[in-house]
Swiss-Prot record:
Keyword list, A-Z: Cytoplasm, Endonuclease, Hydrolase, Magnesium, Metal-binding, mRNA processing, Nuclease, RNA-binding, rRNA processing, rRNA-binding, tRNA processing
Principal subcellular localization: cytoplasm
Keyword Protease tagged: no
Disulfide bonds: none
InterPro entries (UniProt xref): dsRBD_dom, RNase_III, RNase_III_dom, RNase_III_sf
Protein known as: Ribonuclease 3
Species, as recorded: Treponema succinifaciens (strain ATCC 33096 / DSM 2489 / 6091)
Length: 369
């Protein structure tokens, strides 16, 4: 990997390595180290990364579905349901797609036989890479859990078809009576074989079963992705299929949360927004809000507090105030208003298939290819 590649990987996983050799080791397959015995491969890093990812996902599910009530643990999901959800989140397919979406597989160090057999396309190889990167971060940060948690969350948010946000949309859609959400990618076809290369196409699941293909809109150069919840349609557009799906899924998720608030609350209390957000979390409407505080000084030397209210699926909302107590409320109010009052953009009607210079825009109304 050159300096630009290393920079891309580090920015993508939201972590800067102190020891760049560990990062390169994460991308080194055993076949390459056998040809270059002075180098270590990524197999042990993969082992540690697998264990870390397992713990992170289990904790994430605990915070989402379980709580202590009357000194006992109660859970919205039983053991079988939790096991199934976990298997989806950390499945070989899910982790491999994360790596394929972001394009990390092209940086792998492969032996000649692996190169010849194009193993960089293998799901197992990409799954191993995902876990090895996490293992490399663990070794580099001396197992700092906050940093590992941040990296795990970032990497899982590289939006696979069966990503965590997809599970939240699916769960809320059923719970609120909308039924199974329908995932519908836009696809273009061409008679030119050069356009059907892996860089231009991405195989994905539609909903939680079936497969289709999607490529860029030849007019805009952008990917498009649609999600339907009941009669409500949401369209995402992005430079890559992962970003397009993320944009559509976030719209659907925000819509479902607003619907859940309407069903559970007559009125929201905006006088104490931090408390209201906590109540929404306790009632499992939203994930738990994380707060980050930072103190600095203005031009007159007066202390000022900056607060970031961070909510998974929404992003970060900031405020500044001389009072640490008040700055938390200010940041919470921005987030609460965004959750409850922001108008969610919906698509009234998806376009029917049209033709662009010999390329057919294919829309599958039944969600099947």
């Amino acid at each position: 990997m050159n300096r630009q590649d290393i920079g891309f990987v580090q920015s993508s996983i939201n972590y800067q390595f102190k020891n760049l050799q560990l990062l390169e080791q994460a991308f080194t397959r055993k076949s390459y180290s056998e040809e270059h015995p002075e180098l270590q491969n990524n197999e042990v890093l993969e082992f540690y990364g697998d264990e870390i990812l397992d713990f992170f996902v289990t904790k994430m599910m605990y915070k989402r579905f379980s709580r202590i009530l009357n000194n006992e643990l109660v859970s919205e999901k039983n053991e079988g349901e939790l096991t199934k959800l976990k298997s989806i989140l950390v499945s070989k397919e899910s982790l491999a797609r994360c790596m394929y979406n972001i394009g990390f597989s092209k940086f792998l160090y492969l032996g000649k036989s692996d190169e010849k057999n194009e193993v960089y396309k293998s799901k197992s190889v990409n799954e191993d890479l995902f876990e090895a990167i996490i293992g490399a971060v663990a070794a580099d940060c001396d197992w700092n859990y906050e940093k590992l948690e941040k990296v795990c969350r970032t990497m899982l948010d590289m939006e696979t078809t069966n990503g965590y946000l997809a599970l939240l949309v699916k769960e809320k859609s059923h719970r609120l009576g909308f039924g199974e959400p329908c995932y519908r990618p836009f696809a273009w076809q061409t008679d030119n074989p050069e356009d059907w290369q892996s860089d231009n196409l991405f195989n994905m699941g539609i909903g939680f079963g079936g497969f289709g293909s999607t490529s860029k809109n030849p007019k805009t150069g952008k990917h498009e992705y649609g999600i339907q919840v009941g009669e409500n349609k949401f369209t995402g557009i992005g430079d890559g299929i992962a970003q397009a799906k993320l944009n559509a899924e976030q719209k659907a998720y925000h819509f479902l949360i607003q619907e859940e608030i309407k069903q559970q609350f007559q009125n929201l209390d905006y006088t104490n927004p931090a408390s209201t957000l906590h109540e929404l979390f306790q009632k499992k409407v939203i994930m738990e809000v994380r707060y980050e505080f930072n103190e600095y000084h203005d031009e007159n030397g007066n202390p000022i507090w900056n607060c970031k209210a961070i909510l998974e699926g929404y992003g970060t909302f900031e405020a500044d105030n001389a009072s640490k107590k008040q700055v938390k409320q200010d940041a919470s109010l921005k987030l609460l208003k965004f959750i409850a009052k922001t108008k969610i953009e919906q698509t009234e009607k998806w376009e029917i298939p049209t033709f662009y210079h010999g390329m057919a825009r294919i829309w599958h109304d039944e969600g099947k290819i």
